[in-house]
Amino acid sequence: MYETIQTPFNYGGLTLKNRIIFAPTTFGLSDEDYFEKIRRIAAGGCAMIIVGDVPVGKSHFGKSLFDKKGFAFYEKVIGIAHDNDCKVCAQLHQSDSNIKAMLKYVPGVLTKRISMQELRPLLNNEVAPYITNMPHKKVKEITSAFGTAAVLAKKAGFDMIQIHGDRMCGSFSSSIYNHRTDEYGGTVENRARFAVEAVSAVREKLPDMPIDYKLAVRQENPHYGNAGVIEDELRVFVPMLEKAGVTSFHVTLANHSDLENTIPPKNHPYFSEPGCFLKFCDEVRQYTNLPICGVGGLTDPDFMEKQLADGRIQCAAMSRQLLADPDWVNKLKDGHADQIHRCVRCNKKCLGGLMQHQGTHCIY
């Protein structure tokens, strides 16, 4: 059983031992707890871990490949995964948060007058002016930095690069946030330029490196997500990314709204069904033959086997389910699917724990 899930696959130039990927996840843990979490997930049998939010420059808020301590941190993460026969992908990103704007909210957060739930919309309101008014020279510096960061990622031992198509790439892509009047704004082609240049910078530096693109799709009617591109714009956006050097797509809903839209609980009014974002994969498939990884509400091995066997997606990414049971893949392999701890999509200790500064965990 579950033959397709367990079949090796060439995902955008990288051979994976099976079709299961650990989706990029913010943990909010100490280094040692983070290393242990990575070890458990890798040992559980997934083919690749995507390490989320690897900055393309020096960072004030987290680990960076651009300093010795951060570089060593990523080397250790990679070593732990590789020791467990698990590939590792670096999700390169550039935040679209205006640091100066963020600082004015720090006192309120520290005194708890502003909750994390209240902070998010405040920061989102700062995105449009930040993106729209960013100096042309700064834009070029950032897109070029993706290439520099990719070289460091390869040196550290990462097997694949993923360009984070939400964050700044997504905000430049979005007509909601991008009101520029130069070559980076206006038409779909112009709004895609930032992302295309980021991909091109990586491809120029690393001609043979597999490049995954986290493609953030904005839905209308009803409206969900603010960054990224709307479905009708995929016909322009997807071929441009492929031409620039993307070798696979990781397709999901655009962010910059309520986190429970992009990490939907079981009682979500619109995204409650298994594989809740796979319809966006169907849209992307119309414009590319590259491998597509689906994500969102994937917990049931029977459902996932069918999607993979039918060719709807080529890989399946999970975060909450592998937090609930890191041994998901091994249990399938050993014929013990009935023993899997199923994620119930309650968001209590994963998203809930993160928002309460207690780290990302699970009720199990």
Model-predicted regions and their roles:
Residues M1-Y364:
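Flavin-dependent oxidoreductase catalytic cores
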